[in-house]
A protein has these predicted regions:
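Gram-negative bacterial Sec-dependent N-terminal signal peptides
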Residues: 1-24
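Subset of outer-membrane beta-barrel
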Residues: 25-273
Length: 273
């Protein structure tokens, strides 16, 4: 949406200031900034400035007065190992093994099947990031401001299979172990997630020092952090429990983002958050 035809070169340095719970400076999805390689600290349109650098609220054209971003939604998912289905398969074979041991029927075959499933589940991983945001910005030459709402989440799921479990199941399968102790199996499934939600108001002011114009912006905001730490043995795995109260912790607080930017010339912009 910027009308300049030249290529904007950017120098970016970032740090989280007044952080209640540190989060990456690019903890949002916005098509233009993503297409530019995440250089939004120095190149954002004023309408998304609160997401990247509140100082950029002053970087508007003379005919700009209002901008509404409603909403910006994005997601990235990496699951090459099909973790969810494989975790379900492990759980299904565990239940069959559990039943076989209790009934003393088909134990060796059930142990062999469970070992195979655990081998497939070994060291697999899935990751995902999801974000949604909305911004309403008012452009003016005195004190541009904006209302910002943003939520960003990241999830990681993986399995940890112990070699001792594979050896134990192998011995059960070949008949070396006949008195089976189900508690001897300790392989685990892990699910971790964090969701950070911000609600804030951004302000910016253009200043001048020794003839060099620059802008300072601030976004005081309320922040909620939801943490999930799902850590269970494969025998207790249930994907519906991932967001249960037992594994969920919430924190609330207030913090602020502070940013600055200046145009060194027509081709160079420096941004700092």
């Amino acid at each position: 949406m910027m009308k300049k035809n030249h290529i904007t070169r950017t120098i970016i340095a970032s740090a989280v200031l007044f952080s209640f719970n540190a989060a990456a400076a690019t903890s949002y999805f916005e098509a233009r900034n993503d297409a530019m390689g995440g250089t939004g600290v120095a190149s954002s349109h004023y309408g998304v400035a609160p997401l990247a650098n509140p100082a950029l609220l002053t970087k508007h054209n003379s005919n700009d007065d209002f901008s509404l971003l409603l909403p910006s939604v994005g997601a990235q998912v990496a699951d090459p190992d099909d973790v969810s289905n494989k975790a379900d398969d492990v759980k299904d074979d565990w239940d069959l093994f559990d039943s076989a041991v209790d009934n003393q029927h088909g134990v060796q075959q059930a142990a062999a099947n469970l070992k195979h499933r655990l081998q497939e589940f070994r060291n697999i991983n899935a990751d995902a990031q999801v974000g949604v945001s909305a911004v309403a910005a008012m452009a003016n030459d005195t004190l541009p401001f904006a209302l910002m709402v943003k939520s960003y989440g990241t999830v990681s799921v993986n399995g940890k299979v112990n070699d001792a479990d594979l050896d134990y199941l192998d011995k059960v399968a070949n008949g070396t172990i006949t008195d089976v102790d189900k508690n001897a199996l300790t392989s685990r499934a892990f699910g971790r997630a964090a969701v950070i939600t911000d609600v804030g108001i951004s302000f910016a002011k253009e200043l001048e020092t020794a003839g060099q114009k620059w802008s300072l912006g601030v976004t005081p905001k309320y922040q909620r952090v939801d943490l999930f730490n799902y850590n269970v043995t494969v025998r207790d795995y249930d994907k519906d429990d991932f967001d249960g109260d037992k594994y969920h912790n919430t924190k609330n607080g207030f913090n602020a983002d502070i940013g600055a930017y200046t145009d060194l010339n027509d081709n160079w912009t420096v941004g700092l958050v």
